[in-house]
Swiss-Prot record:
UniProt key word DNA-binding: yes
Positions of Mg(2+) binding: E7, D107
GO biological process, one term: intron homing
Zinc finger (C4-type) boundaries: 978-1006, 1025-1050
Additional record remark: When a topoisomerase transiently breaks a DNA backbone bond, it simultaneously forms a protein-DNA link, in which a tyrosyl oxygen in the enzyme is joined to a DNA phosphorus at one end of the enzyme-severed DNA strand.
Protein name: DNA topoisomerase 1
Quaternary structure annotation from Swiss-Prot or TrEMBL: Monomer.
Molecular function in Gene Ontology: DNA binding; DNA topoisomerase type I (single strand cut, ATP-independent) activity; endonuclease activity; zinc ion binding
Region (Interaction with DNA), start-end ranges: 196-201
Entry's EC annotation: 5.6.2.1, 3.1.-.-
Protein's UniProt keywords contain Zinc: yes
Originating species: Pyrococcus furiosus (strain ATCC 43587 / DSM 3638 / JCM 8422 / Vc1)
Domain Toprim, chain residue ranges per copy: 1-141
Catalytic residues, chain numbering: Y690 (o-(5'-phospho-dna)-tyrosine intermediate)
């Protein structure tokens, strides 16, 4: 048995669903889920961590410093609030005793490797070197299966060691320096006050302090500005003096006098025009920043709204048949991720990855019936690809007209590069399954797969298949005829054979050539061959259902399978689902058909093609009913879409009827990468787009025109859409950032109905739509005018700016701020009517404080922290009381004093260079050029020297910090007088456990202590009880009060007398 360890519970579920040959069995232990499944004859258990299960803690904690002797302990011991991890550790510990092999399937990065390493070593109690590694970059079924068949022999010890080193260094720095500061205050004041700093926290606080010092040390300087106020065309205007600031008041006075005496004239006019290019498409970060600027949305709120827009409606009935790379499947039966067929920009069939969406519906749906009998059930807002008014466009169901024509798939080019070897390697690599080679040799598919993946075998002919060397089945195209025939006849798998009701001439002779025995029994005719039965299981053979894995990828196989199914059924008496599947398969062979009177009728024009393609394999005279399928052909040859329609893998059918009905139940949709459409019941429909992206590039194959045509139906976007549709070419402006998994954020073209979107969703949708339209538009042209007015030797300037060509600003200008200042017409030599020469006194201003966003940006620029840690570091600074203010960050006196102390005694710890130096060493560990032991030892040496110097000055440091810290502390709560020495009995807290107790203020000279309840407010009563012990009231949150004596032996204490 094998234990697969994932990083998080949801990832464990996805891995289990992907690897299971049948649905995995979900179990729970200690309230934690795990999964059992079979893969290639092997039993697997897929379980998970929940992030880091282990953290660092000192082996022998004396609460002193320096301390370097650390060990990995359960994270709930190392950190408060992580108790939930205990059950995950217990689960892995129990499961590890039931298995012999281990596979790490955590995220493939340093943290993922540390999580896997520590889970193996401490929870499972095994050497991490014995585990194999699943390496994947996406959680699609295809990627996970590929990772399963390409296991790394071990975990990546370079990444694991680098991650372990980083954890240890961060612990060394954070814990030792925090303890040093805390001990310094204790030595100086006798108070335990916890202060903290660290490798990244220190440098971050340092640059905030630097800004605060700039502000505090800033001395405002007076200066004067001079303005020339004049009148032109009945309006007042202001021109500014050529010097921004005049530092001498007397000079300012002199200038004013000289200007007043001299006539003012226009001496120069400078006009410039600049192109302002359109903005690039939205990545998530840019969308978040602009939404904050325009609407005040937080980044989290923007992401939530974008996710909501992404998942809004656009859904299909659960029985909708989807054309996948494995065959035609009901959408409700699809795995969460996989591969479907889609139409590319040129309307050619292509394959693309999908992700399944599911939601509950209680709403109106639409039944769209085409003239060829095809039916499709959609929610009101799910778009269908239609030909309308000479153009192709995606139109939601509730906007469809009966005059519209719908696009269906029709494969016009065979794709036969998929062979038996490809099929066998996809469905199994079991040690018990064998391929029979052309020379008669047998080779296990497991070994064969490894040889192919290593490139040692590139071209090999496979002629047969064997399971456990119990017989063999020959692999020829005719095999698919037999499988199709058995499916049509309802052949049931029983034991090592397939049973049909009676012998038929169609398969006599064929079974013999395929090495399958025919045996007559009381039940009927048995096709006996263990290897054949094994193959049927692997390709998901089901009686009476025209569907097996693999046939869709090879047209010869598809022809043979359909011929066999036809010979067995004559296409009569079939279920509607079977008819639909056969209709889609015929479309993939380039044959159009019609469903009428519960029968499948081939298009009269395609009858000859039907007979030619299936006649190659059929053993009967092919007779099939025909009908004139009303294919639309009246295309506008001037249309932009005409060449693509003519050469595409499609045909177009009119709509017969559109009916509404109410539906309550599950509905589904797909998110399809790159092509953003898929084939449902043979019809091209749209999908959703994905908001979590770092890309500033639109999909290469995206049909921009489709989307813009749909957006033109919204009145407020119509003028801009029509402008773009009139352009000879739609070419977007794009940015440099690219996300290999997801394109930039853009509107899909589905049109929201009134009431579909909330107010906030509507705001964000408007911004996304306008940004999308803007990237296709022409640059804006801005004109600036600078007029020089001279009065004697003195010059004044007045400037204006205006947009002379709107370009993209026409659609996106509401989210861009440009000052529009239009000046009157001036002429060189024109005399200016001066109303006033004004002198104003001003003062210089200090630099602005950082905002939270500016802090994150500064950390990025300095290389401090990571995307995952920067926000938390800033939050820690708030929690420690080092900074305050949510919009404008101010460093508190405590924060200032901590940095002042670190600068004076341990300047290295707040050095950006030190942080960068050790980050470089982490990279060298990963590359195998340094060992983690070398880096950790160097860190110990560096830190030891720092702390040795710190200890020499510990008292001075403590005295400096105590002035701030102790002054801010609340006075201790006095509950009475000590019966032994007369000192104050005060509430204290254990430095290790944090638990409270009552003790004498004269400790350590007096050791009187009392225990006390850990919950509730303590209220002194000024009363005493046994042996002079004080009596106090404990008030709970619900208002109840308890009067108790603090003496443990007091009867009153033992009964806890309730006070009302």
């Amino acid at each position: 048995m094998i234990l697969v360890i994932a990083e998080k519970p949801n990832v464990a579920r996805k891995i289990a669903m992907a690897l299971a040959e049948v649905k995995p069995i979900k179990k729970t232990l200690f309230g934690v889920p795990y999964y059992e499944l079979i893969r290639d004859g092997k039993r697997l258990i897929v379980a998970s961590a929940v992030g880091h299960l282990y953290g660092l803690a000192p082996k022998n904690d004396f609460f002193g410093y320096p301390i370097f002797d650390v060990e990995w302990v359960p994270v709930y011991i190392a950190e408060k609030g992580k108790e939930y991890a205990k059950d995950y550790i217990k689960l892995l510990s129990v499961l590890s005793k039931r298995v012999r092999e281990f596979i790490v399937a955590c995220d493939y990065d340093t943290e993922g490797e540390v999580i896997g390493y520590t889970a193996l070593k401490y929870a499972c109690g095994v050497d991490p070197g014995v585990a194999k590694r699943m390496k994947f970059s996406a959680l699609t079924k295809r990627d996970l299966i590929k990772a399963w068949y390409n296991l790394e022999p071990t975990i990546n010890f370079g990444m694991a060691n680098a991650g372990i080193a980083r954890h240890i260094l961060d612990w060394y720095w954070g814990v030792n320096l925090s303890r040093a500061l805390t001990h310094a205050i204790k030595r100086a004041s006798g108070k335990w006050v916890v202060l903290s700093t660290g490798r990244v926290q220190g440098p971050t606080l340092k640059f905030l302090v630097d800004r605060e010092r700039e502000i505090q040390s800033f001395v405002p300087q007076p200066y004067w500005v001079i303005k020339l106020i004049f009148e032109k065309n009945g309006k007042k205007y202001t021109a500014n003096y050529e010097k921004d600031k005049i530092w001498d008041e007397n000079e300012a006075k002199r200038i004013v006098l000289e200007v007043k005496k001299a006539p003012a004239r226009v001496t120069n006019i400078e006009v410039k025009q600049q192109n302002r290019n359109p903005p690039v498409p939205f990545d998530l970060g840019t969308l978040q920043r602009e939404a904050y600027s325009a609407f005040g949305f937080s980044p989290k709120k923007t992401l939530d709204i974008a996710q909501s827009l992404y998942e809004k409606g656009f859904c299909l009935h659960p029985d909708t048949l989807i054309l996948t790379s494995q065959g035609v499947r009901k959408i409700k039966e699809l795995s969460r991720e996989g591969e479907v067929f889609a139409l590319d920009f040129n309307l050619k069939l292509s394959k693309a990855k999908y992700r399944l969406l599911e939601r509950d519906a209680d709403e109106q749906m639409y039944k769209v019936t085409l003239l060829d009998g095809t039916e499709l059930y959609l929610t009101a807002d799910h778009p269908v690809l239609v030909y309308r008014e000479g153009n192709l466009a995606f139109v939601p169901a509730d906007k469809l007209r009966e005059t519209d024509h719908v696009v269906l798939v029709l494969n016009k080019s065979a794709r036969d590069n998929y062979g038996f070897l490809d099929l066998l390697l996809e469905i199994t690599d079991s040690q018990e399954d064998y391929a029979i080679l052309e020379n008669g040799e047998t080779l296990s598919l497991h070994s064969l797969k490894m040889l192919v993946e290593r490139g040692e075998i590139k071209d090999i002919a496979v002629v047969g298949f064997s399971h456990n060397n119990f017989g063999k089945v020959m692999l020829r195209d005719e095999l698919w005829y037999l499988i199709g025939y058995l499916a049509g006849k309802g052949g049931e798998i029983k034991g090592n054979g397939v049973v049909i009701s009676s012998r038929t001439k169609e398969i006599v002779g064929l079974t013999k050539s395929l090495n399958i025995d025919l045996i007559e029994t009381e039940e009927g005719i048995v096709l006996s061959n263990k290897s054949f039965v094994r193959l049927l299981h692997l390709i998901h053979y089901t009686p009476r259902v025209p569907e097996v894995y693999g046939i869709i990828n090879n047209t010869e196989w598809l022809k043979a399978f359909l011929a066999g199914y036809y010979d067995a059924t004559l296409l009569e008496g079939l279920t509607l689902e079977a008819l639909y599947k056969i209709k889609v398969y015929l479309q993939l062979l380039g044959i159009r058909a019609k469903i009428e009177d519960n029968k499948l009728k081939v298009h009269l024009e395609d009858l000859q093609r039907f007979r030619e393609l299936l006649g190659k394999f059929s053993r009967r005279k092919l007779y099939v009913e025909t009908s004139q399928v009303p294919v639309f052909t009246d295309f506008d040859e001037r249309s932009y879409d005409f060449p693509r329609i003519l050469g595409g893998d499609i045909y177009i059918i009119g709509i017969k009827s559109i009916e509404k009905f109410h539906y309550k139940g599950k509905v589904y949709d797909l998110v399809v990468e790159n092509y953003h459409n898929f084939i449902a019941n043979g019809i091209a429909v749209h999908n959703c787009s994905y908001p979590r992206t770092e890309s500033q590039k639109l999909p290469k194959n995206l049909n921009y025109k489709f989307i813009i045509q749909n957006l033109a139906r919204i009145p407020e976007y119509r003028p801009y859409a029509h402008l773009l549709l009139g352009m000879p070419e739609l070419k977007p402006v794009e940015g440099k950032k690219e996300d290999p998994a997801h394109p930039a954020i853009y509107p899909t073209g589905e049109i929201p109905r009134p009431g579909d979107l909330t107010k906030d969703e509507a705001l964000l949708y408007d911004m996304i739509v306008r940004r999308f339209l803007a990237v296709f538009m022409e640059p804006a042209v801005r004109e600036t005018v600078k007029v020089t007015i001279s009065a004697g030797k003195h010059k004044f300037f007045i400037s204006g700016g205006r947009t002379v060509k709107e370009g993209w600003l026409r659609v996106y200008g509401k989210y861009v701020k440009f000052d529009e200042v239009t000046l009157p017409t001036f002429f060189i030599g024109e005399r200016i009517k001066v109303l006033q020469v004004k002198r104003e006194k001003k003062k210089t201003k200090p630099p602005a404080r950082y905002s939270p966003a500016a802090v994150i940006k500064k950390m990025e620029d300095l290389g401090l922290g990571t995307k995952a840690t920067r926000a938390q570091i800033l939050e820690t600074l708030y929690q420690r009381g080092y900074i305050e203010g949510k919009k404008s960050i101010k460093v508190t006196p405590l924060g200032m004093k901590v940095i002042e102390t670190l600068e004076k005694y341990v300047p290295e710890i707040i050095s950006v260079e030190l942080t960068r130096e050790f980050e470089k060493k982490m990279e060298l560990i990963m590359e195998g050029k340094l060992t983690k032991e070398e880096v950790i030892e160097e860190a110990k040496i560096r830190l030891t020297k720092i702390l040795e110097e710190f200890k020499k000055k510990e008292l001075e440091i403590g005295l400096e910090l105590a002035k701030i810290v102790v002054g801010e502390e609340k006075p201790p709560l006095i509950v009475g007088k000590c019966p032994k020495c007369g000192g104050d009995l005060i509430v204290k807290y254990n430095e290790k456990t944090g638990k409270r107790f009552v003790g004498c203020s004269n400790w350590p000279k007096c050791n009187v202590t009392y225990p006390i309840l850990q919950r509730g407010e303590i209220i002194p009563t000024n009363k005493t009880c046994c042996n002079g012990a004080p009596v106090v009231i404990i008030r709970e949150k619900d208002g109840r009060e308890w009067e108790i004596c603090l003496d443990m032996n007091c009867k009153e204490y033992n009964t806890i007398k309730k006070k009302r």
